């Protein structure tokens, strides 16, 4: 259940599930997110989950209904019908794409081959999709050391680049700027143009499969 909520505009409420960013907190967010999607209330225009918050955008004519619904949500601890998919995503960790592997080695006190085994054996939770269409925030790596963002973000990062900051990973769906430490590249399509929806969804899981540079180039062709 969420801890607090507040009205953030005439047509939106923000539910706050606490400060911690972890699987259990996010599971509560996703539980309510999936519940609202399943119920398909006519007065809810959009629902946006994040690590530990849930934004509900509603039709202003139904403010009383949304207030009653939020009170109801507070009593729902877990919604069991959470459909999730585990995605196996091929990634090439070759140094040509892992431009910041030295940062990873220094921050986590392990050589990059060891990190590759560590990263590719982790089952990541899709915490949220945001900032650009299809961009997934994945966690959590079992590390207790800090790997900060780059001091000088890159102006241009190729689509498919995989980045790491602390215990989180992202996959850049499009060419863009960014400050995450790049560790590899994938040809996985993060956005379905036919359905106009992201391929990954909050609550899904991801496991990376390490492939050679030759295999990666063949996959791109």
Predicted regions and their residues:
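Glycine-rich active-site loops that engage anionic ligands at enzyme catalytic sites
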Residues: 1-221
């Amino acid at each position: 259940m969420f801890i607090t909520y507040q009205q953030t505009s005439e047509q939106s409420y923000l539910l706050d599930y606490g400060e911690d960013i972890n699987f259990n907190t996010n599971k509560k967010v996703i539980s309510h997110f999936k519940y609202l999607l399943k119920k398909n209330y006519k007065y809810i225009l959009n629902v946006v989950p994040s690590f530990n918050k849930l934004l509900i955008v509603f039709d202003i004519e139904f403010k009383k209904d949304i207030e009653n619904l939020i009170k109801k949500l507070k009593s729902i601890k877990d919604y069991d019908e959470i459909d999730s998919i585990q995605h196996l995503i091929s990634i090439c960790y070759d140094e040509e794409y892992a431009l910041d592997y030295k940062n990873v080695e220094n921050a986590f006190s392990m050589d990059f081959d060891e990190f590759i085994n560590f990263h590719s054996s982790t089952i990541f939770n899709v915490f949220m999709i945001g900032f650009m269409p299809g961009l997934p925030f994945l966690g959590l790596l079992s590390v207790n050391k800090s790997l900060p963002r780059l001091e000088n973000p890159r102006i241009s990062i190729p689509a498919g680049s995989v980045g790491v900051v602390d215990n989180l990973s992202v996959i850049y769906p499009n060419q863009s700027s960014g400050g995450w430490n790049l560790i590899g590249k994938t040809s996985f399509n993060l956005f379905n143009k036919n359905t106009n929806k992201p391929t990954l969804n909050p609550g899904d899981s991801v496991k990376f499969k390490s492939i050679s540079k030759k295999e990666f180039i063949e996959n791109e062709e």
